[in-house]
């Protein structure tokens, strides 16, 4: 079950220039975004742990994105 709501993802695709978006396209984009977010979050958690913290910060996310 998807964690991200479909409507905002549909709006993002339309904001990128699409006039029409199929439900399958939105579902696939949600899947891709969730997979990417989980990957980044896991890296950020490891960075926080390595720094001796339990709290993930915005800097951890930025660093995870640059890896």
From Swiss-Prot:
Keyword DNA-binding recorded: yes
Annotated signal sequence range: none
Subcellular location: Cytoplasm; Chromosome
Keywords linked to the UniProt accession: Chromosome, Cytoplasm, DNA-binding
GO CC, alphabetical: chromosome; cytoplasm
MF (Gene Ontology): DNA binding; protein heterodimerization activity
Main localisation: cytoplasm
Family annotation (Pfam families): CBFD_NFYB_HMF (PF00808)
Record carries keyword Iron-sulfur: no
InterPro entries: Archaeal_histone_HMF, CBFA_NFYB_domain, Histone-fold, HmfB-like
Subunit structure: Homodimer or heterodimer with another histone. Dimers then assemble into higher oligomers, with the DNA wrapped around the protein core.
Family recorded in the similarity comment: Belongs to the archaeal histone HMF family.
Free-text function comment from the UniProt entry: Binds and compact DNA (95 to 150 base pairs) to form nucleosome-like structures that contain positive DNA supercoils. Increases the resistance of DNA to thermal denaturation (in vitro).
Name of the protein: Probable archaeal histone A1-2
Species, as recorded: Archaeoglobus fulgidus (strain ATCC 49558 / DSM 4304 / JCM 9628 / NBRC 100126 / VC-16)
Gene that this sequence comes from: hpyA1-2
């Amino acid at each position: 079950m998807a964690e991200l709501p479909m409507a905002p993802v549909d709006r993002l695709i339309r904001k990128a220039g699409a006039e029409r978006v199929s439900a399958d396209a939105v579902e696939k984009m949600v899947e891709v975004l969730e997979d990417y977010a989980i990957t980044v979050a896991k890296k950020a958690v490891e960075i926080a742990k390595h720094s001796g913290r339990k709290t993930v910060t915005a800097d951890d996310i930025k660093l995870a994105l640059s890896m």
